[in-house]
Amino acid sequence: MSLIVQKFGGSSVANAQRVMNVAKIVTDTYKEGNDVIVVVSAQGDTTDDLIEKANEINPKASKREMDMLLTAGEQISISLLAMAIEKLGYPVVSLLGWQAGFNTNKAYGSARIENIKTERLQSELDKKKIIIVAGFQGVNKSDDLTTLGRGGSDTSAVAIAAALHADRCQIFTDVTGVYTADPRKIENAQKLSDITYDEMLELATLGAQVLNNRSVEMAKKYSVELEVLSSLVKEPGTIVREVAKMEKMLIRGVTKDTDVARISVVGMKDIPGNAFKMFSKLAAKKINIDVILQSVGRDGTKDISFTCASSHAAEAVEILEDLFGLEGAVVSSDTSVAKISIVGAGMQSHSGTASKMFGALYEAGINISMISTSEITISVLIEKELADKAVAAVHKAFFG
């Protein structure tokens, strides 16, 4: 007998027919003699709809009250799935995050899981029940409901798998695995049979929508092997593990991220500590910085540009104007950009990867404004309107 954790996203339970389809997948797993814990997201666009309703009432609602509202979405989906499983004649219980033992910190809207008290989960497993858990949520030390942020249900599933030492953690989505590019936009995108944690983490961070990056971080930390597969099509998916078994491809994927802003500070004084002052202030406001470019002038000044999420652009500009505006520096933001990235451990042992990528963009007539590299990633900043064209050109260069 194995313990299987299964996670189903909002699209997998978007309507009654899909809820019944998920119930069939879950009960088929249970019939094989397995213990089953299922983590479910809110149906379809429920979370977005709830946010819209909140904004109609109070656009500046507190994060605590927003979390109270948003946890309602998962409560609906877990109860409907439990009803579907009951209809099929199987023992089942649905649990909210706090009932399942999820304890978090107090960061409303983006809470971190501190621990899971597994007694209730283990008790229900001992009764041979299928357990349906609301993803994306928990409770803090003040007994307030909290949410884990976008993609938090992936993290909930991995956390349960780690806490109970599950034999498998399956992440069901609307695609059949992890692909070399978005298969809905690139016709010859190839499905990967497996991928390393590090490669998957880079893909998730750089714009791939298949897995939440925090869930991959947790899976790597606790050695939870993940399987990404479709709830709509029955076929093998992609395994995410420490070491990929398939022969290393040069790269594993091409991603685009259009939620990007380029922030530029032009004419700041070229003195020790200014860059530290800049990035420490941004870090204090939890603004994550990615690609960085610095150029030094001949008049005792320097220019620094960097990228961050477009949602943080206005706040970043305000911080930097307060820091350097009186010195005569000019701060600006540009959200008409996109980041195109390639990811793959294979590039560590192969030369010419960057030139191949840059050549593909050149042939497509696409200019590069910024470049960032790591051991397994190369990212470039380009015009946003050319993002899809760039992904297609780079994918063709590496995969044909």
Model-derived regions: residue spans:
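Nucleotide/pyrophosphate-binding catalytic subdomain
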Residues: 1-216, 382-383
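A conserved regulatory-domain signal marking ACT and ACT-like small-molecule sensing domains
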Residues: 237-400
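Short hydrophobic alpha-helical runs that function as membrane-insertion/retention elements
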Residues: 168-172, 226-228, 290
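Short phosphate-binding/catalytic loops that engage adenosine nucleotides
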Residues: 34, 90, 224, 287, ...
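Glycine-rich beta-alpha junction loops
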Residues: 43, 175-177, 222-226, 230-235, ...
